[in-house]
Amino acid sequence: MSGGRRVYIDDTPGETRGIIESDQGFEHILIERDGDDPARRLGAVSVGRITRVEPGLSGAFVDLGRSEGFLPLPRKASAHIGQKVEVEVVAEPREAKGPTLRMLAPAEGEVRLIRAGPSVREWLERLAQGVTPITGKAAIEAGWAAIEDAAVPAMPHGGPDVAVERTRAMIAVDIDQPPVPGKGLNARDRQNANHEGLKIAARLIRLRRWGGLVAVDLLGAGHDGARITAAARAAFGGDPAIAYGPVNRFGVLQLVLPWTFTPLEEQTRPDIESAARDLARKLNHALLADTTRARVTARCHGDISKIAAPLVARLGPRAHVMADDSLPPTQVIVE
């Protein structure tokens, strides 16, 4: 633990989760799965081949082997189909789009991966240097809690009420302060609510792994623009890729955040494979919670059990899975 930060690694078969928690709440959840294409991970470097040049999009599509990525190009840059380029992933896939790439250098030879992006453990070391990760049952529970917090965040008692919503065009943040009976809000109260609200909004946006245009509807009017901008920089960070705008006359602060990881809601969208991974995680949690039990069995629908069986086998001889087609695909019973 360092500076109130806690780091967790849940290394359940099929999926590794890394979680960072601060005194304000969960800050990051990183997910790495068996079968993920390493060429699509943030920070991966590959030799790719340009397959299409799209002047209208100011870029080109690049074959990375198992998938394509999009390479933005300067207006006067020359590129042609078949050209080999060395590229780095600067934003992971989202909304049915492939990864966004950055040109490193011209290249030769076959399309290939040169260097995979950092693993979950490597990202945790970068984001929380020197903090020893917590593993086991507590790490599994932290992952569940972080995903729940991202979906239904709890506001601090007595603090501002902050709504953070994403549309296709932007992220909208609304900061409000619930009234206290018999007490009005003065200028200092509004300032404190806005500063605390910016911290909450920044934490939730990081946790949800969102980027793009952010519009923050601040509480009150007549804001000190310099103070608000300083508070926003403290909350969202000093990354030079973040663009901060002024507070406009309507009391709205705008900023632009770079996209990095795939949004959390996309990466955790339920399907049959995620159900199998969830089963393995629940079974692993039960095994860790009671090490005296000789046998722990998870019952689930047959379609899930077929995919889950290899993952369960990696948990050891105490773990078992049983097909039960009377159960819906969303239900798992651990016994």
Pin down the residues of each PLM region.
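Extended, charged alpha/beta regions that create polyanion-binding interfaces
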Residues: 1-57, 63-71, 77-169, 320-335
